[in-house]
Amino acid sequence: MPSAGSVNAANPAVDTSAQTGRYDPTALEQRWQESWKADGVDTTEVGGEKPGFFALSMFPYPSGSLHMGHVRNYVITDVIARVQRMLGHAVLHPMGWDAFGLPAENAAIERNVDPGEWTDRNIDQMRAQLDRLGLSIDWSREQATCHSDYYRWTQWLFLELLEGGLAYRKNATVNWDPVDQTVLANEQVDGDGRSWRSGALVEQRQLNQWFLRITDYAEPLLNDLDALKGWPERVRTMQANWIGRSEGAEISFNVEGAQNQTITVFTTRPDTLAGASYVVLAPENELVDSLSSEEQKDTVEAFRKEVARLSTIERTCDDRPKRGVPIGSHVINPLTGVVLPVWIADYVLAEYGTGAVMGVPAHDQRDIAFAQSNGLPIQQVIDAEGAAEAIAAGQAWTDAGTLVNSGSFDGTASSEAKGAITGHGAEQGWARSKVTYRLRDWLISRQRYWGCPIPVIHCDNCGAVPVPREDLPVELPRGIDLSGKGGSPLSQQSDWVNVACPRCGKPAKRETDTMDTFMCSSWYFLRFADPHNTEKPFSKEAVNRWLPVKQYVGGIEHAILHLLYARFFTKALKDRGLIDINEPFERLLTQGMVQGVTYRNATTGKYIAPADVADAEDPRDPNTGDKLEVLFEKMSKSKYNGVDPAAVIDRYGADTARMFILFKAPPEKDLEWDDADVEGQFRFLQRLWRLVEAGSARIDSLEPMQRPADLSDADSDVRRALHLAIEAVSEDLSDEIQLNTAISELMKLSNAISSTGIDALSAPVLQEALSGLVRLLAPFAPHLAEEFWNRLGGSGSVHRQSWPVLDPTALVQDSVEVVIQVKGKVRGKLQVPASAGKEELERLALASDVAEKWLEGAAPRRVIVVPGKLVNLVP
């Protein structure tokens, strides 16, 4: 760590001889952290009449190692929590651990350790790392989703949803590893469709699994986005697109030669019905077996096996060629009577819509590519200028126009034809208006061990029976062998699986799937309001006291799944009468990534560690001599651009790390790590140290003092600087949270005090200025602010003080500085009375040395005056 003596003093007016010690953040920060713990400074105020403020960071997976992305998230939330506490709120600022999931299970398999022990050890490590940051977290409310006293209530809430008809079982497709005989998560399948562990080609299989009916809430989830004014527009748009409301029609095509058998499709373009030249079923559609002809059955079956190896992402990728085969059946277009072939294709999914689509090649780009590949007809039915030429060139016409080749609907505008054709079909019984959503029901089953057990028992006599609530939690068996092979690990634990049915008493088996980890994170914020309740997951009274979360902070990567599931849970639990709130998070801040510099060989694609780059000005690959690309990218081990928070804290202290990460970029923008800027923040804190040391020589108490009736110019200037800072920092920390500009204001204030000089100020104004500066600093650099408060004679903790109050009278100036321009170029500045009007400003400007020099005695043709700002003289 650089010594204070090695840094130039920025402000010579500061009397550095008054220093009594060197800024040593390591000892100072540890001392104050221990003091805060002993005094319970960060404990949530439960009683009293203060309004509540719930500040929450998205809780982390306990990997065991804190990274700079974590630091940024938690420090931003901490500043908000500290400010709100000083503004008079009772603040709830808790922390927990999203502790179930695949990484711990994989680590257990690879290292032959118990995932619970592995996770608890990681939690202890990360808690200690978080403590070093000086976060004002109430650790008495800590929760870990893998502990049974938490997942007992996850199971309890699952039973609530089951009783409410929101949880159910059905068959669904999973990734199946045929070698290890187990189900794989999507992230365990590589880009070539192979298992990450065995290397086998992954197959798609149907398994009976648990779902939640999130689609029942599609409409309120979409409509209520409008009420989330405190959320980024980008996130609201992403959720709206994910929910994906579509208005259209369901149209039924009669199967040729089959009485009372139809294929129903959903389309948003019923106006193009006459242009349909084929119908496509998903390979998994149950109609395929009955509609496939004898001649095509072998071809169909072979194709279905090929498709079973593809992931959903591969099947729906726009860039991938669409493949299919005819099944040997035909349907009749209900509008035109034309007979159309039925195909199966890889791009149609059984779980979307009806599992069937009509192909209209002339007016859908995917359909035209499929038709051209398979020799299917392309019939234009929407005409507009340029439409025929586009279709002839292989580009589908997807815009509006006028109907052609559509019988009695020819000449109708496509916008009108949508309703007209749907209405015509409704009268004849083959169409109906329909609103659909892209959103699918939430599949929560996971064939893994390290997750929350699903509290259901399967009985041959009674079916799926909920575990009685008094028997919760259904605990995971510990100390079992995890090989990663042979299906669900729980299914192999016979002592755990085999139980008596709670309803009839006959032999039965436990559900061996565990829950998606998003189940645990969809309600954890509610538990924080009432963490020690042993009778229920939370009381309605506690939730009403603290919820909704006033400020939620986390990454944009959670914009859809976590945030959508949390909103669904909140609405569902409200409908069950458990809570009164309709939305969980009032305001949302999605912080940008922390990026580090990378060196990449564009030829080989390999990243080079900075330590191996000899010359940063001319970076080259040490092995090939190739010139390296220099980029800023998200920090990762594979790119050699990570920065260990512990190393930064060891060298500079937590306050410097906090100040840098808050100052370098606006919270929502990506942050580029720069060691020089870290050093710059350390130097700023050293300057503050010297400033307060000098001030403490004149002040031994922060009890308010009576200001003189007549202030000196120095006193007035510093008071104005102080209250300008109070006004600006308060604004920066209100609706639009701009922490970087708030720190800039602190720098301006410290410079104003230093440049004026400690000895030039009266004791009351010096006291007011330093008291205000330290309190404004407290949320950003809590340890140093506490030290300053103590050294200046403040009583109690600075973090229990009130936020500085703006005095508008301090902002009033007797004089102001205006800019003098000649022909629009700045040529000088002039001190003028603050009350000077246009005529007075013009007179003073013309009488100034600037006018004499640049006008050379000539009268200007024009004088432009902006009161209090500038005078522009135009010769």
From Swiss-Prot:
Keywords assigned by UniProt, alphabetized: Aminoacyl-tRNA synthetase, ATP-binding, Cytoplasm, Ligase, Nucleotide-binding, Protein biosynthesis
The short sequence motif called 'HIGH' region sits at 60-70
Motif placement: 'KMSKS' region? 634-638
Among PROSITE patterns, the record links this protein to: AA_TRNA_LIGASE_I
Task: List ligand-binding residues for ATP.
Answer: K637
Q: Tell me which NCBIfam families the record gives.
A: leuS_bact
Q: Which HAMAP family match?
A: Leu_tRNA_synth_B
What this protein is called in its record is Leucine--tRNA ligase
- Encoding gene per record: leuS
